[in-house]
Each structure stands twice: as C-alpha cells, then as structure tokens.
Amino acid sequence: MASGILVNVKEEVTCPICLELLTQPLSLDCGHSFCQACLTANHKKSMLDKGESSCPVCRISYQPENIRPNRHVANIVEKLREVKLSPEGQKVDHCAHHGEKLLLFCQEDGKVICWLCERSQEHRGHHTFLTEEVAREYQVKLQAALEMLRQKQQEAEELEADIREEKASWKTQIQYDKTNVLADFEQLRDILDWEESNELQNLEKEEEDILKSLTKSETEMVQQTQSVRELISDLERRLQGSVMELLQGVDGVIKRMENVTLKKPETFPKNQRRVFRAPDLKGMLEVFRELTDVRRYWVDVTVAPNNISCAVISEDMRQVSSPKPQIIYGARGTRYQTFMNFNYCTGILGSQSITSGKHYWEVDVSKKSAWILGVCAGFQPDAMCNIEKNENYQPKYGYWVIGLEEGVKCSAFQDGSFHTPSAPFIVPLSVIICPDRVGVFLDYEACTVSFFNITNHGSLIYKFSHCSFSQPVFPYLNPRKCGVPMTLCSPSS
C-alpha cells in the first residue's frame, strides 16, 4: 500500500515534458510545474513559433515574470529520491539457513549473510559490514571495471579485425607470389624445373606456417573477445540487480576482472621475406647455359708446394690455409701477434701450368671471411714477400684475381690509374649472395678469365677481358689471414 502511495506521489512531481522527477521545479499561474531547463526550452520554442508563451499542458498563456520556483515540490522530490520505488528495491532477501534478513556482508567470504550467520562458526572472527555500507564502494569498483572492460572489448575487437585483415593480406600476397613464380618458371622449364618445385614448396610451407599461426591467433582473439563479453555481461547483471546479487561472490568477479589481459596476435613483417625473383629471364638462361658449357672443361687442380709460401697445405694438395700468427716478444716481455707479409707469403700456385686451351676449376671458400683467388702468370716467388698489402694484384703484374674482405666486401683487382700506378684499382662487386663456392674459367686463346658464383645458381661475378698471357699461367689461391681453409674441388664433387 505504501508503495502505491509513493508511486502516486512520484506522478505528481514528474515533469510533463521530460517525464523525469522535477529538477529545479518552476510553477506557472495555471498550477502546472516543470523542470527549469524544460520550461526554458519550451518558452524559446513557443516564442519562435507563436510569439507568446503558453503552458505545455493546458495551453494557457503566461507571462515569464510570473514564473516562480516551487520549493515545496523541490523538497518532495528530494525526499522521494531517497526512497526506492522499484519492487526489487523494496524486497528484503532472507537467509536460507536461518530465515533472517540478509543485512550483513562478510569480507573474508565475499557473501551476504544474516546476523545469525555472523555468529556461526563459519563466519566467527570475520570482518562484517552492513550491506548498504559496502554496496556503494563495490558499485564504484565494478563501474570502473565495466568501463575498463568496455575499452578492452573495443581493443579486442580491433585486434580481431586486424588479424583477419592480416590473414587475408597474407593469403593474397602469397597467392600473388605463387602466380609470379609459376609465370617465371614457365620460360625456364627445361633447365629450372627443380628450382620451380623448390620455390613453390617454400612458399606453400610459408603459407601453411603463417596461415596456421594466424588462424591460431584468430581463434585466440575470438575466445579473448568472447571472454571479455561474458565478464561484461556478468558485471552488467550485477550492477542492474539487487544488492545481494551485486555482492554475492564479488571478490571472485573482481579477481577475474583484474586478470583480464589482452594478448596481441603474432604478425609477420613482409619486408623481411625472401621471395624468388627473376627480373632478367633471358640473362638467367644465358648464365645457366654458360656455366653448363664451361663445366665441360673442368680440370683436376692441386697446389704445388714451394719453399717461399708459408701457407699450410693438406696431404692431398687440395686444401690451403694460413699458418698461425707468429709470437714476438717486445720490451718488458710484452707479447705481440704478427702476420708479416701475409698477403703474399700465404699465396700459392696450382701445380698445372696452362699455356693453351680452356680450363675450369672450382674453389670452396665457405665460412671464410677473407680470400683471394684467380690466375697468376710468370710467378716470381722470390719477389712476393717483399711487396706489402695488395700492390702486386694487378693484371700488368700478371694477376687476374678477385677477393673477399671482412666477410662481405667482394672486389676485383684491376690496373692502377695514371695518377696511382702502383696501387691496384679496386672494383667493388655487387653480389646478392656471398659465394661459398667460386668457379674459375680460363680461356687462354680468348684472353679471358671469368668467375662464377656457384652458390647463386652460377651467376657471373666478374670477367677479365683482353688479358695478356705472354707466358704460362697458373691457378692462384691465397687464404689471407683467415684461418679457415680454402679447398680445390674435384670434378666429381
């Protein structure tokens, strides 16, 4: 009955315009009351439409100066706001064990209890509070948690959309790559069948691995989003329900909320991928044919030991390495390591003297950070150890060689310029893949020396033309200061 009376009172103090409890109520001469903001907006609209102000309920005209604040109604509204009108607000739950009202909250157990529960063994010694005292505190916490989770939900949905876009992009990209590979290899089918198969397998493996990982990430993102949605629904239900529903198990909900972390999906940078490209198919075909042709002249090369070179030679005369550095003791017993005259004292010739014809051999330089190789004419070992650095490595002195420094700098040595004739002209060589194995082809009659990168499908590294072979020439190897050996490969390898 009391509830019905309160409902009737609420209707009397409800604004006819916004249908909410009156805020700063103003009354007209006709007796109707409105919110100050609502009446002000209605007055402006009436003046624009009709040129006069009238009551929104009974349409009786009024003068703005006759409007008066209704403090009596304002007091009624204030009292009414303190009373809960909903059936849930008037409802008092009772303890299932004792039948008493549930008016206490146990902090340790996170439960709503009655006064008899408080005195029971289960809750004895626990910290208990009136539900009304702690409800507001937890409501603020849960409201903040709700806002945070809504933000995380938005972030999760954005991550989910990003991963789907990433997945589609990768699928399109790899499909595009596969199409290009197929088109490229169509023109090189006779020679490059194995290359095509290898590249497609790599792409398919890459597609499988990446899409598998992205699919897994997508599933995790969906589960992550769903988990956040479920927690949000739980919080909304608690916030909209009764005090008991708000507080029952609230600590567990807060712990779940605090443990919510958004895991970002794994992505794969496209700019770091290695994808097969064949920009010059005709040139590639010529390279393959040239390498196939010169390998018909493969000769079995070994080195020739001498008393001048300090290079270390294997028993089968195929492997050459630099010796260990000498230890020199200076003043006060200081120890120094030295590689005196290493550039030329570690150089050594092949045993074969070449005076005509075509000759090809290969040298394994894998894992070496420095080396020099090629051909040498008119070798004079007595003079070599007296020349420092790279000054002797010039065609005019009988050297047609290329070399590697610091593991990445590949160069060819040409004759010095007019201004610096004693120093060789260093030609930087652009190699996409640093060679682990180098092929050397000497055409005595054509006066050419060519170098091939066997590691990169036999591509041409450099070619010396118009060579002056006025005397016999020999294969030349120099392991330099790098302790890793260089090996002459047999034709059967």
Curated annotation (Swiss-Prot):
Q: Identify the domain of life.
A: Eukaryota
Q: Where are the zinc fingers (B box-type)?
A: 90-132
Q: Where is this region: Required for interaction with GABARAP and for autophagy?
A: 185-198
- A GO term (biological process) for this protein? host-mediated suppression of symbiont invasion
Positions of post-translational N-acetylalanine modification: 2
UniProt-listed Pfam families: SPRY, zf-B_box, zf-RING_UBOX
Record's keyword annotation contains rRNA processing: no
Q: What residues bind Zn(2+), as annotated?
A: 95, 98, 117, 123
Could you list the residue ranges forming a coiled coil in this record?
131-240
Read off the SMART domains from this record. BBOX, RING, SPRY
What PROSITE patterns does the record point to? B302_SPRY (PS50188), ZF_BBOX (PS50119), ZF_RING_1 (PS00518), ZF_RING_2 (PS50089)
Indicate where this protein is primarily found. Answer: cytoplasm
Domain (B30.2/SPRY) ranges: 281-493
Report what the Swiss-Prot or TrEMBL entry states about this protein's PTMs. Answer: Degraded in a proteasome-independent fashion in the absence of viral infection but in a proteasome-dependent fashion following exposure to restriction sensitive virus. Autoubiquitinated in a RING finger- and UBE2D2-dependent manner. Monoubiquitinated by TRIM21. Deubiquitinated by Yersinia YopJ. Ubiquitination may not lead to proteasomal degradation.
Q: What is its biological role? A: Capsid-specific restriction factor that prevents infection from non-host-adapted retroviruses. Blocks viral replication early in the life cycle, after viral entry but before reverse transcription. In addition to acting as a capsid-specific restriction factor, also acts as a pattern recognition receptor that activates innate immune signaling in response to the retroviral capsid lattice.
Q: What is known of its domains?
A: The B box-type zinc finger domain and the coiled-coil domain contribute to the higher and low order multimerization respectively which is essential for restriction activity. The coiled coil domain is important for higher order multimerization by promoting the initial dimerization. The B30.2/SPRY domain acts as a capsid recognition domain. Polymorphisms in this domain explain the observed species-specific differences among orthologs.
This one is known as Tripartite motif-containing protein 5
Q: Give the organism the record lists.
A: Pan troglodytes (Chimpanzee)
Q: What are the leading ranks of the lineage? A: Eukaryota, Metazoa, Chordata, Craniata, Vertebrata
